[in-house]
């Protein structure tokens, strides 16, 4: 199967998981990116079962609305039973690198309030150690050089994310992103806490403190379900 076919496979598997485990009338937390889009497309077929969704980005909001799925602000919701999102990398503990699509801060906020985080990914995203995929850090623009120096001191190579026109990429929150290459993150929870404590960091794209509860992993043999210890 192609990577796109695997994404559609796990998107449908996530919709099936939601149908089986989330009661009718609930609100679903939805991530951002090409794999999350496959979940949205599959969820559209059963949208009448649920009140709607909480979105993690402007792009996801637009896709949800295009399917006629009502989008709620997180502040309107008392409880969120499930959050479904992709990952750029995921390790054996359920810790992830996320943010390749630029929505890491809102993704982390929505994930933090959900009872269950369901990661959907193709098999290429499973890694023994996080860091081959550049680690995104959303930063307040005036802090980007200072943050870059801190990253370099840890052995990373900071690269400012830019648009195709060469201008700094701006997040939905009005900030910039530094992508850090050359890392091997053996202790993702400690590394997440360290980077998040730097002045000027909005959030780092490590999801270790709040990692995945389970992963629906698309492989040539079908969908593998991996459950991570709490």
Curated annotation (Swiss-Prot):
Any one biological process term the GO annotation gives: pentose-phosphate shunt, non-oxidative branch
Catalytic function, reaction form: aldehydo-D-ribose 5-phosphate = D-ribulose 5-phosphate
Pathway recorded for this protein: Carbohydrate degradation; pentose phosphate pathway; D-ribose 5-phosphate from D-ribulose 5-phosphate (non-oxidative stage): step 1/1
Listed InterPro entries: NagB/RpiA_transferase-like (IPR037171), Ribose5P_isomerase_typA_subgr (IPR020672), Ribose5P_isomerase_type_A (IPR004788)
Molecular function (Gene Ontology), one example: ribose-5-phosphate isomerase activity
Keywords assigned: Isomerase
A Gene Ontology cellular-component term: cytosol
Catalytic residues (positions): 107
Gene3D superfamilies assigned: 3.30.70.260, 3.40.50.1360
Residues that bind substrate: 32-35, 85-88, 98-101, 125
Known EC number: 5.3.1.6
Quaternary structure note: Homodimer.
UniProt cross-references to NCBIfam families, sorted A to Z: PRK00702.1 (NF001924), rpiA (TIGR00021)
PANTHER family: RIBOSE-5-PHOSPHATE ISOMERASE
Family per record: Belongs to the ribose 5-phosphate isomerase family.
Function according to Swiss-Prot or TrEMBL: Catalyzes the reversible conversion of ribose-5-phosphate to ribulose 5-phosphate.
Name the record gives this protein: Ribose-5-phosphate isomerase A
Phylogenetic placement of the source organism: Bacteria, Pseudomonadati, Pseudomonadota, Betaproteobacteria, Burkholderiales
Gene transcribed to yield this protein: rpiA
């Amino acid at each position: 199967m192609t990577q796109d076919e695997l994404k559609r496979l796990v998107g449908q598997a996530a919709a099936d998981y939601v149908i089986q485990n989330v009661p009718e009338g609930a609100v679903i937390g939805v991530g951002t990116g090409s794999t999350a889009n496959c979940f949205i497309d599959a969820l559209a077929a059963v949208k009448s079962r649920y009140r709607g969704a909480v979105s993690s980005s402007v792009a996801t909001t637009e896709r949800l609305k295009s399917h006629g799925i009502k989008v709620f602000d997180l502040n309107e919701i008392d409880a969120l039973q499930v959050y479904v999102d992709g990952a750029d990398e995921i390790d054996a503990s359920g810790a992830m690198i996320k943010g390749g699509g630029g929505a890491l801060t809102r993704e982390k906020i929505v994930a933090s309030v959900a009872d269950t985080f369901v990661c959907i990914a193709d098999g290429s995203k499973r890694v023994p150690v996080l860091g081959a995929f550049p680690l995104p850090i959303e930063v307040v623009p005036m802090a980007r050089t200072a943050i870059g120096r801190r990253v370099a001191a840890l052995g990373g190579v900071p690269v400012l994310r830019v648009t195709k026109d060469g201008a700094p990429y701006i997040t939905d929150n009005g900030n910039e992103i530094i992508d850090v290459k050359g890392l091997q993150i053996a202790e993702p929870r400690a590394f997440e806490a360290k980077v998040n404590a730097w002045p000027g960091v909005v959030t780092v794209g490590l999801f270790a403190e709040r990692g995945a509860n389970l992963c629906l992993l698309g492989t040539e043999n079908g969908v593998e379900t991996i459950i991570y210890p709490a």
